[in-house]
UniProtKB/Swiss-Prot annotation:
One GO CC term, this protein: cytoplasm
Similarity-based family: Belongs to the GroES chaperonin family.
Residue ranges crossing the lipid bilayer per the database entry: none
Lineage: Bacteria, Bacillati, Bacillota, Bacilli, Lactobacillales
GO biological process: chaperone cofactor-dependent protein refolding
SMART domains: Cpn10
Main location: cytoplasm
GO MF entry, a single one: metal ion binding
Name of the protein this chain belongs to: Co-chaperonin GroES
Gene3D superfamilies associated with the record: GroES chaperonin
Organism annotation: Oenococcus oeni (strain ATCC BAA-331 / PSU-1)
Length: 91
């Protein structure tokens, strides 16, 4: 598993179910990017003098900005590495 640095958090992306309109599948490039995921790993380091505790913990389901982070694939699994500020809320 990847170990995030700084204020970064690793998310497992929740893929939405197949969308159909009138029985027709919508093309992948026409779908909205996912905005929900589960926290997989949290950085143990801090940025600058910020020693504040993280606002999320491993296992939390979160919503994030759809244009946030860097998507990576590790062992066939897709993950998103985001800054803590890109997480909009905990579900």
């Amino acid at each position: 598993m990847i170990k995030p640095l700084g204020d970064r958090i690793v998310l497992s992306i929740d893929q939405p179910e197949e969308e159909k309109v009138g029985g027709i599948l919508i093309a992948n490039n026409a779908k909205e990017k996912p905005v929900m995921g589960s926290v997989v790993a949290i950085s143990e380091t801090s940025v600058g003098d910020s020693k504040a505790p993280k606002s999320v913990k491993v296992g939390d389901k979160v919503m994030f900005d759809k244009y946030a982070g860097s998507q990576v694939t590790i062992d066939g699994e897709d993950y998103l590495i985001v800054h803590e500020k890109d997480i909009l809320g905990v579900l």
